[in-house]
Amino acid sequence: MVNLVCDAIIPDGPMKDVEEIEKSILTTYKKSIWSKFLKAINDFDMIQDGDKIAIGVSGGKDSLLLVKLFQELKKDRRKKFDFKAVSLNPGFRHSDLDNFKNNLDKLNIECEIIDTNIWEIANEKAKDYPCFLCAKMRRGILYTQVEELGFNKLTLGHHFDDVIETTLINMFYAGTMKTMTPKVPSTSGKLELIRPLIYVKEADIIDYTKTNGIRAMNCGCTIEAGKTSSKRREVKDLLAALEEKNPGIKQSVFNSMKNINLDYVFGYTGGKEVE
């Protein structure tokens, strides 16, 4: 049976002091998180001097970590850039929103929260499957707001496992070879989307979150009550089973997106449909 419920991350204890959390990034998680974050930025030339970067913050484990990493990067001063955390409130419950704001306060994160009624609209217009419309609306509003605020880049918290799962979802269910790229222009062309966590494994993000006592938002959706995509869950469970029997499977899938031999595929469409 496929588990359709988002896995809750239960902290090991109360949240640690922000100074201790920040120190852990450069000590305990230097190899598994910090170094991989820096490597992705350098490998894909994600940040240039003068950049104005918005960090999309959902309140979940990935985006909360991402902001802390950028705070540490800013201290380095080798790259001259500005950044700001930006979050959409699609209609969170008061308790979830309060927890989110409490996390921001304790983690010393300044974040602009933009209130919307996305969930209400998505549920009214697409009752059977509101998730697709919700995601589309959230992207559209976030991109527009970030552009209007004068940013030229938007940072998203997608990690190593997101890349692998997306690759297989596209293969299994859409019949296409496509994945999340480290950086890509937005549809309007006014923004560049960057993913500095692309080398960071979800298990390490979970460990960082639990160990530091961060009660990150799990799934604040008031409509689907914690359910996640059945396709993504199927792929996640499949990968876990394969990785247990054959350690390195995930890395191989990830590497495959960097090693496509066009001489040995049926056709290359360049984003266009094959006739």
Q: Where do the model's predicted regions map?
A:
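ATP-dependent adenylation/nucleotidyltransferase module used to activate substrates
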Residues: 2-167, 173-182, 203-211
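Conserved active-site and cofactor/substrate-binding residues in soluble primary-metabolism enzymes
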Residues: 32, 137, 200, 230, ...
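Catalytic subdomain that performs nucleotidyl-dependent activation
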Residues: 82-83, 161-241
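Residues that form or immediately flank small-molecule/cofactor binding pockets and catalytic motifs
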Residues: 90, 116-118, 198, 221, ...
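Alpha-helix boundary/capping detector
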Residues: 96, 130, 168, 172, ...
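A general structural signal for short secondary-structure boundary/capping elements
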Residues: 131-136, 158, 199-203, 242-245, ...
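Short, basic, helix/turn surface patches
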Residues: 136-149, 183-189, 239-256
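The feature marks non-catalytic terminal segments
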Residues: 214-275
